[in-house]
Amino acid sequence: MTDGNQKPDGNSGEQVTVTDKRRIDPETGEVRHVPPGDMPGGTAAADAAHTEDKVAELTADLQRVQADFANYRKRALRDQQAAADRAKASVVSQLLGVLDDLERARKHGDLESGPLKSVADKLDSALTGLGLVAFGAEGEDFDPVLHEAVQHEGDGGQGSKPVIGTVMRQGYQLGEQVLRHALVGVVDTVVVDAAELESVDDGTAVADTAENDQADQGNSADTLGEQAESEPSGS
């Protein structure tokens, strides 16, 4: 019979593996070659390298996210500024008719004094502060980007230059945006270069000198005639 309290042999069914981790072989006395994975600290070095790679990857992801956010922020600010400019331009455009009425009143002398003058001055000051600029004056060069010609005098031949002769309605510009083109009448003028102008001036000077010489000669002749008449006759 088998005793129920008999303990099983500790060596039965179990295999014990003993690993000699000594770096020096006790039999040969030489240093053993240990694979990197089996060296003490080899696992730690591999973990450190893996950690560095992971940190570099996460750092690159963070930098990319930061760049994307910076671009988004710039785009949002740009869109916000564009929306504000459109709203401001829309409001100012509604007041251009009021400015036209005030300009007509100014030409008739109705804004020389009184409460209306104060209102007009304050409105002009406020719109100027917003960046509103009026353009279109007689004598300015005609610019099709800013001006709309409703009249044209001249043949527009070679050497001519179109300038504004009359202004029917002023134009307005808010920043770089043209809110309204100026209605103008265009007159073609002849462009004279510096050489032609100098030659014309020289010719005028020569003509003036010749006229002065002729006048001096005439005065000298008159003087001699008067002296001859004033001298007594020898007979």
Curated annotation (Swiss-Prot):
The keyword Nucleus does not apply. Keywords: Chaperone, Cytoplasm, Stress response. The keyword Cytoplasm applies. Signal peptide: none annotated. Residues 1-18 have a biased composition (Polar residues). InterPro entries: GrpE (IPR000740), GrpE_coiled_coil (IPR013805), GrpE_head (IPR009012). One of its GO terms (biological process) is protein folding. It is found in: Cytoplasm. Gene3D superfamilies: 3.90.20.20, Head domain of nucleotide exchange factor GrpE (2.30.22.10). GO terms for cellular component: cytoplasm. Residues 1-50, 198-235 are annotated as: Disordered. HAMAP family: GrpE. This is Protein GrpE. The gene is grpE.
